[in-house]
């Protein structure tokens, strides 16, 4: 793989030990195989990212999982906050309160962690981090220079798109809203002009709490989770408990 040009390896670990990981995955031996892959990556000097799924079941094990991560020599720990759809529909999402506490814990870890910590489908981590930085008396110029302050907001249909096995085009792999098909449509025109793509890039079209949130450009909420829960990808992310003031809608 390295000879073919692979520059980074990404593996999934959903438990702090073999018992927890294999039980969650439902396949005995996967933890051991993953640990072997970690060793292979290090032998080839491949930077390594570990992905962990955040669910109601895995949440209590995350502190122990973090201790494991510190022993693996990784460059990044990416926590994917479950969206109950597709293959994940049989799993339980965490609630808004747990999400908020987890984001604060991750921010605390980020100060001393030997690797980068990031979230997927939990952009409200950026809002938590900014609130914490302001509470620590960081000025906004300094915050803007951090990785959080340079955040890109919603990426679905905004710099990325997803093409399924049958050619169907979606704004992202987690947002299954059909916009066309590469066999019959111009993919560039779909990205540039399809109403789904243009509305995702225009945060003034967002609704509810996300639509009036001062952090919408840096966060924007999970469009995939909004779609899974409400059927409308422009609605509020139900996992974020933040209630913005009515007067804080983004500028047109």
Give the ranges of each region predicted by the language model.
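C-terminal accessory region of radical SAM enzymes
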Residues: 98-143, 168-220, 225
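Radical SAM/AdoMet-radical enzyme domain recognition
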Residues: 1-89, 95
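A structural motif corresponding to the C-terminal lobe/cap of the Radical SAM core domain
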Residues: 70-71, 75, 89-116, 150-153, ...
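Short, acidic, Ser/Thr-enriched surface-loop or helix-capping motifs
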Residues: 71, 163-164
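A structural signal for short, well-ordered beta-strand segments and their strand-loop junctions
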Residues: 49, 78, 116-121, 162
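Short, small/polar residue-rich loop motifs at catalytic or cofactor-binding pockets
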Residues: 154-158
